[in-house]
């Protein structure tokens, strides 16, 4: 990451895609500290790599669920589905993951809370929802003592 910033490449979609996949790998290993750092590093790629929006949204929704941030997960999933309606770029494997996560979140939240979070995710720009989610998850992990200070 320091080299990418030094040479002005931190917005390169290939580099940001690598950061996104590193976030996914760290998350699957249960290393949420590393995952959120990689998600943060990948954010500059969002405006230029719309093909990966479902990876950001679904991955962060899974991380939010792991941290008991169910309203945030619903908002992310809603924004991800809204972006897919606009771009039609969600890969089939992500469609299955998204449907599974939506069902899981919906079963854990009251209908009122789910509907409110879902409505928020539908109206906000995808980039904004993802950036806010990363900040919220960083704060959540820091409070729980899982995120080392930078």
Question: Where are each of the predicted segments found?
Answer:
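Residue signature of alpha-solenoid helical repeat architecture, marking inter-repeat boundaries
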Residues: 10-13, 50-51, 92-93
């Amino acid at each position: 990451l320091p080299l990418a910033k030094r040479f002005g490449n931190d917005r390169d979609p290939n580099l940001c895609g690598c950061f996104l996949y590193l976030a996914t790998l760290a998350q699957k290993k249960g290393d949420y500290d590393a995952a959120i750092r990689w998600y943060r590093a990948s954010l500059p790629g969002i405006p230029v790599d719309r093909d990966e929006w479902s990876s950001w949204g679904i991955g962060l929704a899974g991380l939010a669920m792991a941290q008991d941030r169910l309203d945030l997960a619903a908002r992310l999933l809603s924004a991800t589905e809204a972006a897919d309606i606009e771009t039609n770029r969600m890969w089939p494997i992500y469609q299955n993951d998204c449907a599974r996560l939506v069902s899981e979140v919906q079963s854990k939240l009251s209908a009122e809370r789910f509907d409110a979070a879902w409505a928020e995710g539908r109206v906000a720009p995808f980039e904004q929802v993802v950036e806010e989610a990363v900040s919220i998850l960083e704060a959540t992990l820091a409070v729980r003592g899982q995120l080392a200070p930078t």
